[in-house]
Amino acid sequence: MSRRTKAIAAIAGAASIAIIATGCSPSSDSGEEGGKVELSLATFNDFGYTDELLQEYMDENPNVTIVHNRAATSNDARANYFQKLGKEGLADIEAVEVDWFTEAMQYSDLLAEVPADAKGRWLDWKEAAATDGDGRLVGFGTDIGPQGVCYRSDLFAAAGLPTDRAEVAALLEGDWDNFFNVADQYKAATGKPFIDSANSVLQGLVNQLETAYEEPDGTIVATENPDIEDAYNTVVERAVPISAYAGQWSDDWFASMANGEFAAMLCPGWMHGVISGNAPEVTGWDVADVFPGGGGNWGGSYLTVPANGKNVDEALKLADWLTAPEQQVKAFVNAGTFPSQSDAYEDEGLTAFTNEYFNNAPTGEIGVKRAEAVTVATYKGAQFFQFHDALQNAVTRVFDGVEDQTTSWNTWVTEVSAF
């Protein structure tokens, strides 16, 4: 493994959420007349699996038809997954977000094993997280989410801030206090929020902790971890006042990318496609090679194949193909989903890629540098998703004026103590 790969291998995963909602259709029987197979693929957000990319596979495998369904949110995908896992109704291939992947690994016996010849494809930590106690690899790694800062250069200019991406990186370089100070400066100059959402800051802070809500041995430390309380207080006191929304993924939030409600976002690669897809006519978006506090990773998922599916063998072949380095580089070009495959980091399709939408920013190179900046792999236990979702709700209550800072924290403590 190269020095670069080792540096990137320190990254931990985090989340994604979706744009298009469709239902999950059941798999068709592989024994249909003529050997035709309909494979259902269930994802969320934008994995970069465009119709054109999926058509490549269908052209190479004319007996296969792929039906791609995307859940409305990661929460919806999770609820559907655990409601139906081991029963009926899941897609042939199901995407799982890293924030609840450890939870899924509790049921690894219900998932088909990744073919032996695919092993060793991924960053060490990515593959290890998908390997169960019996040594079975049951998840095909898709992407990771090293974060930079996406910003509107036109809105920065209006506030008297620099607009060149190198100058913006220098402006925002440093700790979170510096980031919030720049945000306060922007708000004072414009009267508008600087960043899209308070809970994106919570995500960024938590993803820089080694331990969040659970210890690796399963010990629950959520309400007793001073780092979590500090993160909550920081978000409520510094991020809420400079944020346009409490959270992300609402209709208004999607629309806000085009209407200038805010000037910046904490931005993993997969967010690039979300921004360009929701603000296609806006010309001011750019990407800076910087992140508060040094480095951060938000994003990353796996493809899993339910072992009781009707087309397990064919589903494994498709999942294998989709997560090969060549296809993940194409997915990155399509949607900014940064590959988790080691060989991809030597591919010029990644390293030399520039994104025309983001003022021709070298987002491939930025992604590699942002990945190298990550030094902490946050442990995310089986209940990470539930604890974190509840803490986001606590921030939202303060943002909406439903509860004050102390009351909302105490509400969270009471709520999660019952988990």
Regions found by a protein language model. Name each.
Residues 2-101, 119, 163, 310, ...:
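Conserved N-terminal structural module of periplasmic/extracytoplasmic solute-binding proteins
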Residues 40-43, 67-70, 92-97, 139-141, ...:
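Structural recognition of the beta-strand scaffold that forms the well-ordered cores
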Residues 59, 132-201, 214-245, 307-313, ...:
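Helix-loop-helix "hinge/cap" segment bordering the ligand-binding cleft or interdomain interface
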Residues 74-78, 196-201, 211-288, 408:
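Extracytoplasmic ligand-binding clamshell segments of periplasmic binding protein
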Residues 78-90, 155-156, 178-185, 238, ...:
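Short helices/loops that flank or line small-molecule/ion binding pockets
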Residues 97-148, 177, 286-287:
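Hinge/lid segment of periplasmic solute-binding proteins
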Residues 240, 277-340:
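Extracytoplasmic/periplasmic substrate-recognition and gating elements
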Residues 357-415:
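C-terminal capping/gating helix-and-loop segments adjacent to ligand/active sites or protein-protein/ligand interfaces
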